[in-house]
Amino acid sequence: MSAAGPIAAAVGRALGRRVTAARQVAGGDINEAWAVRLDDGEVAFLKTRADAAPGEFATEAAGLAWLAEAGARVPEVLAVHDEPPRFLALAWIDGGRLDAAGEVALGSELAALPAAGAPAFGAPPPGAPAGGLRLGALELPAATALDWPAFYAEHRLLALLPHAGQDAAGQRAVEAVAERMDELAGPPEPPARLHGDLWSGNVLAGADGRARLIDPAAHGGHREVDLAMLRLFGRPAARTLAAYAEARPLADGHEERVALWQLFPLLVHAALFGGSYRGAVTEAARRAAA
């Protein structure tokens, strides 16, 4: 992209300012990411993709607003452009490291999400365009329910299983978990407001020592799911977990359910990337059912 390119021109029109420079930056597996300098000196973060679906970036923006409404720190949405070239422009966050206060604040903010709630399991953020749950290049059909075990079994595990490249043993292991969800899911929980893709790479530490949540696939779900995914690709700080537990204690048996909730993101990764994730699905299913 150049400052004279069609995306730069669209960004300028959307923001009411002229783009004077742009450089490509790291920013995800499927999108192009750019640091865009505007004529007033402000820098914006721009994510774009030639084959982005209509409403895709608008849904992400709605998710960020939904999380912010509950008290989570997120980047400010500057503009959404839902016609080609499609893009999402966010306020630039200078990177840094979480300090001790930031680790505590993150735990408290994550605990505020279930307190804010959601209308139903699977419910999208208010104002999001119609469509299913998008995770990278994968989209699950839209569905909502008030029965969490049945929802997780049908619309998460079994919906993904045909796409996850499992052998016969892996398929049987996942199906066995789905059949036992009423038993395995633990005490009933009301629908929580979830980030929906909360791995460590989507927790951005700012130069102020505080975390911002980025790249959400926000929806209503079980509150333990976000925490389980945060533990899947890294280990959240002890201060973060302690602050969460102090603000909103977890139900008995939550440690035994971590593998159960990690099964969903592992199925997503198996569907998107294959390889070792296929075996990880089988292992998680067996641990969940143990």
Task: Identify what each model region corresponds to.
Residues A259-L267:
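Hydrophobic alpha-helical segments that form the core
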Residues G16-R23:
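Conserved N-terminal boundary motif of the eukaryotic protein kinase catalytic domain
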Residues V25-D147:
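ATP-binding pocket architecture of kinase catalytic cores
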Residues P141-A153, L158, P162, P190-R193, ...:
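Active-site Asp-x-Gly
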Residues A3-R13, A118-R193, G206:
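An alpha-helical support segment within catalytic cores of ATP-dependent transferases
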Residues H269-A290:
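ATP/Mg2+ or Mg2+-diphosphate-binding catalytic cores
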Residues M1-G16, R37-G41, A289-A290:
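Short, low-complexity, intrinsically disordered N-terminal peptides in bacterial proteins
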Residues T20, P75-L78, I214, A228:
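A short, local hydrophobic-aromatic micro-motif
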